[in-house]
Amino acid sequence: MSAQTANTASTPTSTVADRPGWAVLGPGGIARRFLSQLPASGGALVAAGSSSTERAQTFADEAAQLGFADVSAATYDEVLADPRVDAVYVSTVHTGHARLVLAALEAGKAVLCEKPLAPNHGTAMALADAARQAGLPLVEAFTYRFHPQTAALLDLVRDGVIGEVTHIDASFAFRTGERTGRLFDVDTAGGGILDVGGYPVTMAAAIVQAATGVAVAEPTELTATGTLGPTGVDEWTVAQLTYRGGITASVRTGVFVQDDNAVAVYGTRGRLLLADPWTLGADPTIEVHTVDEDPRTLSFAGEHPYAREADATTDALRAGAVEAAQMTIDESLATARTLDKWRAAIGLRYPFEAESADIPTVSGRPLRVQDGNPMQYGEIPGVGKRLSRLVMGVDNQPDLAHASAIFDLFVEQGGNVFDTGYIYGGGVLEGRLGKWIQNRGIREDVVVITKGAHTPFCDPESLTKQLLESLERQGTDYADIYMMHRDNPDIPVGEFVDVLDEHRRAGRIRVYGGSNWTPARFDEANAYARANGKHEFEVLSNHFGLAEAYDVPWDGCEHATDAASKAWLEERQVPLLPWSSQARGFFTGRATPEDTSDAELVRCYYSDENFERLRRARELGDRFGVPATAIALAYVLNQPFPTFPLFGPRTIAEARSSMTGLSVDLTPEQVAWLDLRD
């Protein structure tokens, strides 16, 4: 086996006259490794923060021995208020990361945060959003990502040296002596997956990205087995990952089993082998084995990866970026989702994130509506509360931590209306919403839309049974708005009106109406109500948006995109709570006349007229400086009848993108032009 040495010369990123000031928050073992290599960076340690001033002072004294003079030792808040600090390295226990990251960003500091960025994806989303809103770097400290060995590995994959990549094997596991300390404590998010499992996961993702050219790779399938020890954490686990395009990976981690801790990349023409790529000792190597060449070894001696990750963070700060190219925010979010799935596959959920947990805001502060938020508001007679014009759909949030993060963001941006249904998630999502409302103590500040009586249980008896069960799940005694999820024309409409009116008079419902009801049936219900002294239907929730619907996604749905329905809504002034106002992605850019891969999209929306609407939405979007999706939402908001469109963002980033439509005020002429009525 021949050996060759790679060129590992690095260029300093800053001068002594412009030397970024670093603070360490959480001066433990890994912080000392960071400190030991910081002299090789362009920065200098100026402060150490800890919950224990004694620990902070000990760390400052150690820094002085490395040549860092005048290092202050103080509390976290005092360190973040220090004007000498440009960037912070967060290295507390996993559960301490989030609040310190948020506090640092609010203080105007760049952040290098030890892995994992957060214990779960919901919390990680909030941190990513905070960095993007602040315009400051947030970098997850997977140290190996910043080492020349990793860059060389990805170049070898990208250049096709081993042909097409087929499989990746990566492991990081070690055996500790006793089941004590943070690694075995569920309250500090202990266990292998969160401590070191992110290393093989992020390595596999980086290799897939290099092999396929995508910016972020996330497994489409994940299966896993593992062992939960007596303290409740994962002590040993193996996961099998499959990526889009067919590349597979086997990843292993643990805190009570020693593994080889290596990476192997297999391709159609050979393989690449890395021994212990995580701790990055004095001379890490890559072995290159190909079918038509002698094996060779690349050597990467004399590097300081902790210094490199520090410089990458401050380089991003100077450039006005919110991330480092070596480990982007979107990669960190994909990693958090993957680790969530891995833990779920082996049945590991920490007590602080359980469905029954009192999960606080990520900052730990009380939830409040932010000043200068973009929300518009309206009224629906009988509700007794002001309603945000956007309605958060509660039909997709995978766990309480995720739901809490995205619901908190919605409220901070002025939102207060939530739409859920008896059938969503088998009832789990109603309970999830109710628990979040209970945790925040805001039942009288929010409007909850409850739906029930979906086919095949669309009858008065089932309506009552489901309503009572929905209220119990939500932990409340009333629904602000109740809507029948479907209609059943085989049952006289008066029977539905009678039972709904009964529940309203009993105080269980404040306002009621129908989802997926025809205008004719709606009118019939109200004619019966007037004739019999009952409360009328007051709200309708049908599909409505800029794109005209030629069919509906599911059986029993009704749309209101045709001219007759629009005229009826304008005449009656019935508040409409439209679902799928974005036409299931028609305005996102993925719909083109040539692309017929999505049969449902084609069936429901493809026509020359709708593609002309899309063209006009883009043209108007260019004028307003917003995407076509924002124009599509603005079209719904600017109708001559009251509208409260539902949206179901899967992430905080999607929620913010959707809300850009709130800033667009269309004239009646622009609304007509978009709808081809000019």
Which residues are covered by each model-predicted region?
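N-terminal Rossmann-like dinucleotide-binding module
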Residues: 1-66
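C-terminal helix-rich "cap/oligomerization" subdomain common to oxidoreductases
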Residues: 1-15, 87-89, 315-376
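Contiguous beta-strand/loop segments that form the cofactor/metal-binding neighborhood of enzyme cores
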Residues: 2-3, 202-280, 313-316, 340, ...
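C-terminal glycine/acidic-rich active-site capping loop/insertion
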Residues: 19, 267-337, 351
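Beta-strand-loop-alpha-helix segment that lines the small-molecule cofactor/substrate pocket
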Residues: 87, 93-94, 98-145
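Predominantly a Rossmann-like dinucleotide-binding segment in NAD(P)-dependent oxidoreductases
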Residues: 146-222, 229
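Beta/alpha (TIM)-barrel catalytic core signal, keyed to glycine-rich beta->alpha loops juxtaposed to Asp/Glu
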Residues: 239, 487, 491-678
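N-terminal binding-site loop/beta-alpha segment at the start of enzyme catalytic domains
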Residues: 356-446, 505
